Curated annotation (Swiss-Prot):
One of its GO terms (cellular component) is cytoplasm. Signal peptide: none annotated. It is found in: Cytoplasm. Its cofactor is a divalent metal cation. It catalyses: NAD(+) + ATP = ADP + NADP(+) + H(+). Belongs to the NAD kinase family. Involved in the regulation of the intracellular balance of NAD and NADP, and is a key enzyme in the biosynthesis of NADP. Catalyzes specifically the phosphorylation on 2'-hydroxyl of the adenosine moiety of NAD to yield NADP. GO terms for biological process: NAD metabolic process; NADP biosynthetic process. Keywords: ATP-binding, Cytoplasm, Kinase, NAD, NADP, Nucleotide-binding, Transferase. NAD(+) binds at residues 57-58, 133-134, 159, 161, 172-177. The keyword Nucleotide-binding applies. This is NAD kinase.
Amino acid sequence: MMTQMNYTGKVKRVAIIANGKYQSKRVASKLFSVFKDDPDFYLSKKNPDIVISIGGDGMLLSAFHMYEKELDKVRFVGIHTGHLGFYTDYRDFEVDKLIDNLRKDKGEQISYPILKVAITLDDGRVVKARALNEATVKRIEKTMVADVIINHVKFESFRGDGISVSTPTGSTAYNKSLGGAVLHPTIEALQLTEISSLNNRVFRTLGSSIIIPKKDKIELVPKRLGIYTISIDNKTYQLKNVTKVEYFIDDEKIHFVSSPSHTSFWERVKDAFIGETDS
């Protein structure tokens, strides 16, 4: 969905976030040298209007988590300096085009849904997180056994390696490698995908991905105490004695700078997984 922030002539605060690769540092250096003397821009990692991520999707995920509490004020734009990045609009040789587009920028943005996760521990503590791609739960040892509850109704008893819940844009990441569907981000929904479920005459699960609309809630209730591996995008945590994991579509969204260079979702999917096709 395209909307617009109010940028009537104000100086844009820009944060530049880059990974440690030589090419990324070179691009960052060029951007710094241009913006530091430009009266229309102010370089600052504090309270930025625009965050420029230089690297790939991993760097964009890191930038998202750096500013996940400021999503209502921040727009992102990505430059990829290696393999094609799903979230990035510019290649490293298109820096001048990016600078020109930012000078012409009127505050237009493309917005995508994100995931909100609430993890309840056996002592009553609740750990909350946001994910741009997906959140997964796995058991460190033995098979994971958990009830899957949708809108307070027990849907199935899961036995297997784990569960992944992804956003529409995240549907092209780990979810796709698990055999999940690719979901367009204008569909505000979550996708639940099983990780190596056990299915036999005794234990049965649906065995296919489930698309959950925004108004619905997913709950995962582990039936065994122990250590669980919780992955939120590119961050992994080990938590002991998880009693419940809840998943929602967040009220906030991630916003990307909209410009003539913004690549449509299906173009990104084609470029990432199919490449050039015969005419």
